[in-house]
């Protein structure tokens, strides 16, 4: 993880060769002039040649332009269309810029006049962009250094450090989520995922584990039906952060299918390797709880994750089975690859009954249909509460994690009615992301609830400004921002 140090020293001192990143909204100002002077005019010449105007997406890279400067990267931050520079624009610019650095372990980042208040946001973008899941690479090149330390030049170190503390916490939550999603399924399965969660007790979180026996006694028939085909036994893990006195908790629920073969309704071989990511909702919840604990959030929050592996075997659940959920409702299982909703059915109803939360937000890589609807830029938002949906959407916009609210209603809900049980776990293909949400809604009662379908945003095959290809950690920052509005001091 990239180490961030806020320093008040001049960014362009020539005491040692230094790589410098400058985030700017114009090719002018005192900071730009100081860098140009240190480079003996090389910066201004390059800017003129490239037509750099400080616009978002623009960059200039100069290798060793002068003594004392090993590299210079200029990155524009000014949004197109005349919009004001904001934290998201700074994060994205910093993320792009640090990726342009070549072969350095340490760099200085500075911001042009009027942008210094965004220095912690720049550090966040740089840290998230520099993430690399390299745990299993045995041949790591020693000839190509990787950026390890970023010195961020500011005039008020104390103010920057104060604001960075919360961003540091959430960045570690995002990285934890990315790490969990990236792990191979032979390493991360319900028992080992549980062990990773239990390590968070050292942050002050309370962790409770329900094993197969406990869930059987409680009547988690829907979740246990999914798990019965695997040699890896299921777990439900409850993580609590108590920072809000006697207030009712906010509850966050995650789907944790550590590998999804589809069960007897088996998936095609192509792309099945990515089904290790089907625990992305649970990973996001755990990353969030880590962030709340690290920044000592003034709120009561509960994270509940249902952890299973959906496999094919002689003991696997069959299409046509009927299972009884925790709350007593019966479900006709017509497709064993629609398993995430079965896991969430028990976890949602259990959380509602046991903890009486103020609200519930569940996250799941639930449907391929949401990817068809929204692509890879926005997660689907379904809710029974306009106020909750609005709060989540505003939080997402603030941190650059987009949500798009989808319709719900009785016309969709009745498609789930079964002839021989209370409901079936699938309807027709049209609107199937909505039908999945309607299924979940049957288990939340009158509690304010939202479902985030993150199937298109939890894992990407192309890099973004602040995330390499692979696990994104989508949702941790969004929910952390959402929680802030509910804290005691808010």
Curated annotation (Swiss-Prot):
Q: Which reaction does it catalyse?
A: Release of an N-terminal amino acid, Xaa-|-Yaa-, in which Xaa is preferably Leu, but may be other amino acids including Pro although not Arg or Lys, and Yaa may be Pro. Amino acid amides and methyl esters are also readily hydrolyzed, but rates on arylamides are exceedingly low; Release of an N-terminal amino acid, preferentially leucine, but not glutamic or aspartic acids
Active-site residues, record numbering mapped to chain: 267, 341
Task: Print the keywords alphabetically.
Answer: Aminopeptidase, Cytoplasm, Hydrolase, Manganese, Metal-binding, Protease
> Which InterPro entries does the record match to this protein?
Leucine_aapep/pepB (IPR011356), Macro_dom-like (IPR043472), Peptidase_M17_C (IPR000819), Peptidase_M17_leu_NH2_pept (IPR023042), Peptidase_M17_N (IPR008283)
Question: Cofactor comment in the record?
Answer: Binds 2 manganese ions per subunit.
Enzyme Commission no: 3.4.11.1, 3.4.11.10
| Superkingdom field | Bacteria
GO biological process terms held by the UniProt record: proteolysis
Which CDD domains does its entry note?
Peptidase_M17
Compartments it resides in = Cytoplasm
Where is it found, in Gene Ontology cellular component terms? cytoplasm
Q: Which family does it belong to?
A: Belongs to the peptidase M17 family.
PANTHER family documented for this protein? CYTOSOL AMINOPEPTIDASE, LEUCINE AMINOPEPTIDASE-RELATED
Task: State what protein this is by name.
Answer: Probable cytosol aminopeptidase
| UniProt gene name | pepA
